[in-house]
Amino acid sequence: MKKISVLGSTGSIGKKTVDLLLKRKEEYQVEALSTCSNFALLACQAKLLNARYVAISNKRFYKDLKESLLGTGIKVEVGTEGLMNVASLPVDLSVVAVVGIAGLEPVMHVIESGTKVIALANKESIVCGGKLLLKKTEEKNVQIVPIDSEHNAIFQVLQNGNKCVEKIILTASGGSFLNYSLEQLRNVTVGQALSHPTWNMGKKISVDSATMMNKALEIIEAHNLFNISPNRIEAIVHPESIIHGIVIYKDGFNFAVLAEADMAIPISYALSWPERSALSYKLDLTKQKLTFQEPDHKRFPALKLSMEVLNSSSPHTNSIVLNAANEVAVDKFLKSRIDFLEIIKVVKLTVENFDSYTDINSLSDIINIDLESRAIAKEIIKNKVLAYS
């Protein structure tokens, strides 16, 4: 049996992972599960999967979790330290589905633990960790298998390396507002942004999809993860979300990965890698249409911004700044403190106003840049978006 941990087991990716593990209980021994604050669901998952450890980051719910697991023998860890403790458990496979930059430190602990495969759903770890994180995976001989459907697709095609690759293409659904005019985008609501046409996702990533910042972050992730220059990475809009990634080779051949739009498929691949496990999903192309279009950079400027970041003199630092500012702006949008179109404006202004450039040699360097960027973004929102102060 494979020993496995699932960090962020109560989020959208985590729940899908748990569903798959429940169907494959004879294949996996669940060592640890974690959540930020959803103690009730975590306790239920831990009992169903006979987990050895659980961790809850929010100390406020420690007592509730402890009481929910009385008599089970399941060990409870709490706070940031508790999360790092379970991240440090040596397992065969660790699924990291913690949302945002909060996932970076646990990933670093997983790498140091002796775990050999990380099924990674946290793109921010690659975006912000950059070469520092990837160098550490090489030193420790750790394989990252991406769960993001686009990077999972590219990963599958590039199993023999990226030699002779001309370009990689990441597909984007276009999000909730693909066909909205610029004028319509000025008045969209939080509820509308969370109603994704093809994917069932969490709040933050649904908003990122609507602004196309999700794809902007994925471009940076692809650059770092696959060691491919920015000018060889392209994003196109594919509303049906059937083709997840395309690799174009120098001889003119194009390799595309097709699958239904359900995260259970790339999660299953990551769980089973380097093998494959049977799933009931059967794609019938006779009942599908495949359409493509260029992204509209005027309505969705995030893609252009990510390329500017990658082509800047300090791409690693600016990637951290971009991610931090976006997390702040999305949070304010979800709280109705700023409008939809102001999300990317805040991000762009934060990148433009950040000037504390230093070498990035440690996790603390990344965290310091992240914190300073958040402070700048919050100040921009306070001063520029006066209607919401």
From Swiss-Prot:
<dbReference type="Pfam" id="PF08436">
    <property type="entry name" value="DXP_redisom_C"/>
</dbReference>
<dbReference type="GO" id="GO:0051484">
    <property type="term" value="P:isopentenyl diphosphate biosynthetic process, methylerythritol 4-phosphate pathway involved in terpenoid biosynthetic process"/>
</dbReference>
<dbReference type="Pfam" id="PF13288">
    <property type="entry name" value="DXPR_C"/>
</dbReference>
<keyword id="KW-0560">Oxidoreductase</keyword>
<feature type="binding site">
    <location>
        <position position="173"/>
    </location>
    <ligand>
        <name>1-deoxy-D-xylulose 5-phosphate</name>
    </ligand>
</feature>
<keyword id="KW-0479">Metal-binding</keyword>
<feature type="binding site">
    <location>
        <position position="148"/>
    </location>
    <ligand>
        <name>Mn(2+)</name>
    </ligand>
</feature>
<feature type="binding site">
    <location>
        <position position="38"/>
    </location>
    <ligand>
        <name>NADPH</name>
    </ligand>
</feature>
<dbReference type="GO" id="GO:0030604">
    <property type="term" value="F:1-deoxy-D-xylulose-5-phosphate reductoisomerase activity"/>
</dbReference>
<keyword id="KW-0521">NADP</keyword>
<feature type="binding site">
    <location>
        <position position="124"/>
    </location>
    <ligand>
        <name>NADPH</name>
    </ligand>
</feature>
<feature type="binding site">
    <location>
        <position position="215"/>
    </location>
    <ligand>
        <name>1-deoxy-D-xylulose 5-phosphate</name>
    </ligand>
</feature>
<dbReference type="InterPro" id="IPR013644">
    <property type="entry name" value="DXP_reductoisomerase_C"/>
</dbReference>
<dbReference type="InterPro" id="IPR003821">
    <property type="entry name" value="DXP_reductoisomerase"/>
</dbReference>
<comment type="pathway">
    <text>Isoprenoid biosynthesis; isopentenyl diphosphate biosynthesis via DXP pathway; isopentenyl diphosphate from 1-deoxy-D-xylulose 5-phosphate: step 1/6.</text>
</comment>
<dbReference type="GO" id="GO:0030145">
    <property type="term" value="F:manganese ion binding"/>
</dbReference>
<comment type="function">
    <text>Catalyzes the NADPH-dependent rearrangement and reduction of 1-deoxy-D-xylulose-5-phosphate (DXP) to 2-C-methyl-D-erythritol 4-phosphate (MEP).</text>
</comment>
<dbReference type="Pfam" id="PF02670">
    <property type="entry name" value="DXP_reductoisom"/>
</dbReference>
<feature type="binding site">
    <location>
        <position position="12"/>
    </location>
    <ligand>
        <name>NADPH</name>
    </ligand>
</feature>
<keyword id="KW-0464">Manganese</keyword>
<feature type="binding site">
    <location>
        <position position="214"/>
    </location>
    <ligand>
        <name>1-deoxy-D-xylulose 5-phosphate</name>
    </ligand>
</feature>
<feature type="binding site">
    <location>
        <position position="10"/>
    </location>
    <ligand>
        <name>NADPH</name>
    </ligand>
</feature>
<feature type="binding site">
    <location>
        <position position="196"/>
    </location>
    <ligand>
        <name>1-deoxy-D-xylulose 5-phosphate</name>
    </ligand>
</feature>
<dbReference type="GO" id="GO:0070402">
    <property type="term" value="F:NADPH binding"/>
</dbReference>
<dbReference type="InterPro" id="IPR036291">
    <property type="entry name" value="NAD(P)-bd_dom_sf"/>
</dbReference>
<feature type="binding site">
    <location>
        <position position="149"/>
    </location>
    <ligand>
        <name>1-deoxy-D-xylulose 5-phosphate</name>
    </ligand>
</feature>
<protein>
    <recommendedName>
        <fullName>1-deoxy-D-xylulose 5-phosphate reductoisomerase</fullName>
        <ecNumber>1.1.1.267</ecNumber>
    </recommendedName>
</protein>
<dbReference type="InterPro" id="IPR036169">
    <property type="entry name" value="DXPR_C_sf"/>
</dbReference>
<comment type="similarity">
    <text>Belongs to the DXR family.</text>
</comment>
<feature type="binding site">
    <location>
        <position position="122"/>
    </location>
    <ligand>
        <name>NADPH</name>
    </ligand>
</feature>
<feature type="binding site">
    <location>
        <position position="13"/>
    </location>
    <ligand>
        <name>NADPH</name>
    </ligand>
</feature>
<dbReference type="InterPro" id="IPR026877">
    <property type="entry name" value="DXPR_C"/>
</dbReference>
<keyword id="KW-0414">Isoprene biosynthesis</keyword>
<feature type="binding site">
    <location>
        <position position="218"/>
    </location>
    <ligand>
        <name>1-deoxy-D-xylulose 5-phosphate</name>
    </ligand>
</feature>
<feature type="binding site">
    <location>
        <position position="123"/>
    </location>
    <ligand>
        <name>1-deoxy-D-xylulose 5-phosphate</name>
    </ligand>
</feature>
<feature type="binding site">
    <location>
        <position position="209"/>
    </location>
    <ligand>
        <name>1-deoxy-D-xylulose 5-phosphate</name>
    </ligand>
</feature>
<feature type="binding site">
    <location>
        <position position="218"/>
    </location>
    <ligand>
        <name>Mn(2+)</name>
    </ligand>
</feature>
<feature type="binding site">
    <location>
        <position position="150"/>
    </location>
    <ligand>
        <name>Mn(2+)</name>
    </ligand>
</feature>
<dbReference type="InterPro" id="IPR013512">
    <property type="entry name" value="DXP_reductoisomerase_N"/>
</dbReference>
<feature type="binding site">
    <location>
        <position position="11"/>
    </location>
    <ligand>
        <name>NADPH</name>
    </ligand>
</feature>
<feature type="binding site">
    <location>
        <position position="202"/>
    </location>
    <ligand>
        <name>NADPH</name>
    </ligand>
</feature>
<feature type="binding site">
    <location>
        <position position="150"/>
    </location>
    <ligand>
        <name>1-deoxy-D-xylulose 5-phosphate</name>
    </ligand>
</feature>
